[in-house]
UniProtKB/Swiss-Prot annotation:
Membrane-traversing stretches: none
Complex and partners: Part of the ribosomal stalk of the 50S ribosomal subunit. Interacts with L10 and the large rRNA to form the base of the stalk. L10 forms an elongated spine to which L12 dimers bind in a sequential fashion forming a multimeric L10(L12)X complex.
GO BP: translation
MF term (GO), any: large ribosomal subunit rRNA binding
Function: Forms part of the ribosomal stalk which helps the ribosome interact with GTP-bound translation factors.
Protein's name in the database: Large ribosomal subunit protein uL11
PTM (free text): One or more lysine residues are methylated.
Amino acid sequence: MAKKLLGQIKLQIPAGKANPSPPVGPALGQRGINIMEFCKAFNARTQSMEEGVPIPVVIQYYQDKSFTFVTKTPPATVLLKKAAGLKLGKKPASGSKKPGYDSVGKVTMDQVREIAKVKMDDLNANDLDAATKIIAGSARAMGLQVVE
């Protein structure tokens, strides 16, 4: 008989930095999931990624207190900020307060295309051109200029 799925949790955790402190500990602990087991597995899976980049993760937990999880690619906004040279870290730079009027940086179409290749699996796009348009739209919505 298959394990009974009780639910799922969606979190964004910095790559390689999962630990039992909030938000990870309380989110998993109140559902009876082994926190340290998850933290070790997540950190092992994300050790090849750049440390500190937020990674979306979907955790499915079952009636027998076991779990599975899927890591996704970093958010497009993080990749765009890095490509534009905006500050990431404790107090990251935000996008423009008035997108379309004020610009906070520039990204080239080649950078947008590279980000689209990375995000292709998570985007609702059939080909690279459609994914590139989605990422370019996100860049413009953040107040980044997309240049050739």
